[in-house]
Amino acid sequence: MSLHLCPCQATNPVSGLRAGVFGWLREDLAMAYSAFITEFLREAKVPRLSLKDPPPDERLIAKAAEAKDREITGEENSNVGCIRSLLFLVAGELDQAHRLAQEIPTNAGSYIHGMVHRIDDDFGNARYWFRRARTVPAAAEMYRRAAAASVTVASHPSWDPFAVSDMVEASRIDGVSDELRAVLTVEFEVLLEFLCKTTED
């Protein structure tokens, strides 16, 4: 099953990644997700760089709000709060994403909390919550995929959310590169995949 966010214009030199208007997403990830999430991601524009890039999608926000927990995950999964928070985040509803993340006392909850503040340009707060996460969920896989798409990520010995925050902060002045979009898409997809496959972080 292929996962397309929008009509593909080109293929990334990194195997398995395809380019769309808003970034990169591997085509084989549908196997990791429930039917609800797979369909949600087909309609979403990933990654989210800021509240306005891409614009919030009110229809997807409503879908994330109205779906039952079991509908989202397809089975019992204690990470459903984190998963719903990520769906709100990518749809552009930061208040709901923040509300859910701050109520979840896990590494994943803290990490998503940091992602929300990073999107909202509150970089100091983002770094605080990345530190609170202690360990990054699925960090090794996040690094493996992102390093293949980014010289900047590959220059570090492991996944570094602070370095990624620096990249995002710099993009507010220098503009958003395809490299940054690829890195943020990998971050989102690996974290979501991890949460869907496990029941705790």
Functional labels for PLM-detected ranges:
Residues A10-T11, A19:
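Ala/Thr-enriched low-complexity intrinsically disordered regions
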Residues D28-E103, R132, V136-D201:
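N-terminal alpha-helical interaction modules that lie
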Residues L17-A30:
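Short, Lys/Arg-enriched N-terminal segments with co-localized hydrophobic residues
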Residues C6-C8:
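Cysteine-centered motifs
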Residues R99-D121, A138:
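Short, charge-rich amphipathic alpha-helical segments embedded
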Residues F123-R132:
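Conserved alpha-helical segments that form or flank metal/cofactor-binding pockets of metalloenzymes
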